[in-house]
Amino acid sequence: MTAAMYDLMDYDEVLEKFDPVMGLEVHVELATETKMFSAPSAHFGAEPNSNVDPVSLGLPGALPVVNAKGVEWAIKIGLALNCKIAESSRFARKNYFYPDQPKNYQISQYDEPIAYDGYLDVVLDDGTPWRVEIERAHMEEDTGKLTHLGGADGRIHGATASLVDCNRAGIPLIEIVTKPIEGAGERAPEVARAYVGALRDLVKALGVSDARMDQGSMRCDANVSLRPVGTVEFGTRTETKNINSLKSVEQAVRYEMQRQAQVLEDGGEIVQETRHYQETDGSTSKGRPKETAEDYRYFNDPDLPPVIAPKEWVEEIRATLPELPWIRRARIQKEWGLKDEEMRDLVNAGALDLIVETVEAGASASEARSWWVAYLSQKANESGVELDSLSITPQQVARVAALVKEGKLTNKLARQAVDGVLAGEGDVDEVVAARGLEVVRDDGAIEKAVDEALAANPDIVEKYKAGNTKVTGAIVGAVMKATRGKADPAQVNKLIAEKLA
């Protein structure tokens, strides 16, 4: 039976009958200059198939050479995840055929990973701490990228042709695999989101990856299974592949819990398979049967020697670890005088790093918080994207805040300037100039608009002179309308008060 034959079980009913068990596999592309086993550039965005060589194309006789920086950064990630670092680890060949892997095998690590037995402590939305145990973090190379043409949803099923770009083939990856996450119950989707978010913050703080989920430099595979309440044995799992946002991680886990519960309730069986996440409605769709380790026929790569990590080198790397995110947050919270709830809101919104960068660019903490948590979070929600995927930088937000502080933009005009930047109309100053947004500084023009507004509203003038000074809002509104919102409200209020004195 297929998933499409089933409705979703109500979430509360799922939890009454089943316990969810999760396993999360996160792939992080390392921001090295070159690929993991050869010399081409590892930078994102080049012309298709321009960053390739005999190794990444799998040509006969091509021999891989390990990128030392990739190994160093893998150790750095392992240390930050409280992992044990193997003094000796090995690369293995993971054998399978797919067009995005020209060699017909992927260089990975199997039974001898570079880092193992760690944990990452995360904080849930209400401040509850949760420890996620890490099984392993291992090095491998990324695959190429396929673009399927002619299909209804951009996938291979129904496609009439596929384009292969091998630029990504061979880029260094660290795959971080959790141990089974049990006992989360109704909070399982939230735990998944919190963990992936915390991991993203961590690798960005380490400086080893930009962790752009929207660009594929960080991707999550979510394994989900259910077992009847009160039982111990794990159920059959599915693996939803290549999830590319925090919100999608949460939705995919929740959907699979509800889908699997309904399948089991109706007497069906869960098929061990990969699944695809559908951004349009938060559902998952059937992929391919899930292979076992035996299917990949792992064996040690004969072209690569063991990776030796002496304890002295590991300690040297440990000494280079930067201020880690949870320590940094505690410091920032103290410096900014934020309550625990306020700090959680910033973190949960994905706004903290953006706010810090905006402050570093010259804005005050309150100005930066106001823009990112209020206006820009709303814009991100409207667009259905993560906050850091918006087409505006912290430096641009700081520039808008500076123009407001200088009196060159009102708050309303500033929002229009931000809208222009988000729409791709240029940098802040270019948008302000092109849209003619700068506050009017012509005293004569503003005074004329005030005089006309007063003349058109004699009843308001009478009320003001009778002692009701709060009625000037209509006059200010008329002046702002006449100047297309470009007059300085403080200047307008001052002129009104002077003329009615």
From Swiss-Prot:
GO molecular function: asparaginyl-tRNA synthase (glutamine-hydrolyzing) activity; ATP binding; glutaminyl-tRNA synthase (glutamine-hydrolyzing) activity
Domain of life, source organism: Bacteria
Keywords, ordered alphabetically: ATP-binding, Ligase, Nucleotide-binding, Protein biosynthesis
Gene3D superfamilies per the UniProt record, alphabetical: 1.10.10.410
Pfam family, one: GatB_Yqey
Catalysed reactions, as listed in the record: L-glutamyl-tRNA(Gln) + L-glutamine + ATP + H2O = L-glutaminyl-tRNA(Gln) + L-glutamate + ADP + phosphate + H(+); L-aspartyl-tRNA(Asn) + L-glutamine + ATP + H2O = L-asparaginyl-tRNA(Asn) + L-glutamate + ADP + phosphate + 2 H(+)
Composition bias type Basic and acidic residues, residue spans: 288-299
Statement: the UniProt record of this protein carries the keyword Transmembrane: no
Example GO biological process: glutaminyl-tRNAGln biosynthesis via transamidation
EC id: 6.3.5.-
SUPFAM superfamilies: GatB/YqeY motif (SSF89095), Glutamine synthetase/guanido kinase (SSF55931)
Region feature Disordered, mapped onto this chain: 271-299
PANTHER family, per the entry: GLUTAMYL-TRNA GLN AMIDOTRANSFERASE SUBUNIT B MITOCHONDRIAL AND PROKARYOTIC PET112-RELATED, GLUTAMYL-TRNA(GLN) AMIDOTRANSFERASE SUBUNIT B, MITOCHONDRIAL
Description of how the protein assembles with itself and partners: Heterotrimer of A, B and C subunits.
UniProt family annotation: Belongs to the GatB/GatE family. GatB subfamily.
Free-text function comment from the UniProt entry: Allows the formation of correctly charged Asn-tRNA(Asn) or Gln-tRNA(Gln) through the transamidation of misacylated Asp-tRNA(Asn) or Glu-tRNA(Gln) in organisms which lack either or both of asparaginyl-tRNA or glutaminyl-tRNA synthetases. The reaction takes place in the presence of glutamine and ATP through an activated phospho-Asp-tRNA(Asn) or phospho-Glu-tRNA(Gln).
Protein name as catalogued: Aspartyl/glutamyl-tRNA(Asn/Gln) amidotransferase subunit B
UniProt gene name: gatB
